[in-house]
UniProtKB/Swiss-Prot annotation:
Matching InterPro entries: GOLM1/CASC4 (IPR026139)
Segments passing through the bilayer: 13-33
Descriptive protein name: Protein GOLM2
Recorded superkingdom: Eukaryota
Organism: Gallus gallus
Subcellular locations according to the entry: Membrane
Gene: GOLM2
Length: 375
């Protein structure tokens, strides 16, 4: 190596300068290449940035448009929000009004619950009363059924008894009229016998003087006896009795409750006993209803007449009168029973009407109370 103080050759560069120049050239070349490459890269980046700028412009326009749309939506949403706030205020006022209505409804509900509790107690009490009334109605129906059965039985028994009594009365009347006919025939025969005896005695006493008056009285007595014999025959014609205007025609239940008949019935046994006493006494003279006032029979003839008179005729009559009085008493008892049954039926109908009215009143009473509680 040559130092700084050494002599140089003339016309030749030193080597270190050449190296430095080469180094500088290399560095500059490298720098140019590097700058060119960087310029290319920058151009590419610039182109890319330009494309990005275009895209951003497009995107910015799109975003501005979207922003405008969003602003329109925001305005619409703001308007909707204001509308909803107004609706909210209105709904809040309505809610307050509803709260007031709810409170009033709660108060009315409490009142209705109290009314319902009272009405349930009333309904329970009325149900108990209804059950009792049903039991009473069933019992009354059973009694009515029994009364109807008894009524039908009594009516049938009454019809049967009235029919039997009518038949017995007819038989007794026929027997009584036959007995009366027999008695009248017997009395006529006795009268004829007494007239013969009297005429014979008068003939013995007055053989020539008084025959004509006696003969006159005898036809008169015969005419009277014939009339008396014809009287009972008028009652029976062809085996059938003629019905009297005041009679019962064989039906004792049709008779009116005449107090005179009821008063006459107990006196019949006395008259019967009196007649029996008159008949059973042989010493007394029996009463002959059809004898003439001037004619009297002998005591023996009267005793025979008393023996031949059947003592049971008056007893049959009194028995028929007693049967009539018994039938009248039965008819009165049946009428009283029928009247009692009708009174019971009317009372039941009144009770049923009262029950219906009570139920209707309860229904009408419950309706306005429920309406007042709701209002």
């Amino acid at each position: 190596m040559v130092g700084f103080g050494a002599n140089r050759r003339g016309g030749r560069l030193p080597s270190f300068l050449l190296a430095a120049l080469l180094l500088v050239i290399a560095v500059l070349a490298f720098n140019c290449w590097n700058a060119a490459s960087r310029q290319a890269v920058l151009r590419e980046e610039l182109a890319e940035l330009q494309s990005q700028a275009k895209r951003t412009e497009v995107a910015r326009g799109r975003l501005e448009k979207r922003n405008s749309d969003l602003l329109g939506r925001v305005d619409s949403h703001r308007k909707q929000l204001e509308q909803k706030e107004a609706d909210y205020s209105q709904l809040s006022s309505q809610l307050q009004a509803r709260d007031g209505q709810v409170k009033r409804c709660e108060d009315s509900r409490v009142k209705l619950q109290n009314n319902i509790s009272y009405q349930m107690a009333d309904i329970h009490r009325l149900k108990e009363q209804l059950a009792e009334l049903r039991q009473e109605f069933i019992r009354q129906e059973d009694q009515l059924h029994e009364y109807k059965k008894n009524n039908t039985y009594l009516t049938r028994r009454l019809e049967y008894d009235s029919l039997q009594c009518g038949q017995q009365i007819k038989e007794m009347r026929i027997q009584h009229e036959e007995n009366i006919k027999k008695l009248m025939d017997q009395i006529v025969r006795e009268q004829k016998a007494t007239q013969r005896i009297q005429s014979s005695k008068d003939a013995e006493v007055n053989p020539n003087g008084d025959n004509q008056p006696i003969s006159k009285t005898v036809p008169e007595m015969e005419v009277k006896n014939a009339e008396n014999n014809e009287l009972p025959s008028d009652r029976v014609v062809n085996g059938k009795e003629k019905v009297k205007p005041g009679g019962d025609a064989g039906m004792p239940e049709i008779e009116d409750n005449d107090p005179a008949k009821a008063e006459d019935t107990p006196t019949a046994p006395r008259s019967d006993n009196h007649h029996q006493a008159d008949v059973n006494l042989p010493t007394e003279q029996p009463h002959a209803p059809n004898l003439a006032p001037g004619l009297h029979g002998d005591s023996d003839g009267n005793a025979d007449i008393a023996k031949e008179i059947p003592p049971n005729s008056l007893q049959h009559l009194n028995f028929g009168e007693n049967m009539d009085s018994q039938n009248e008493n039965k008819i009165e008892a049946d009428h009283l029973k029928l009247q009692k049954g009708r009174a019971v039926g009317l009372q039941k109908m009144k009770q049923n009407d009262e029950e219906r009215d009570l139920q209707n009143d309860l229904v009408d009473y419950s309706k306005p109370r429920f309406g007042d509680g709701v209002l």
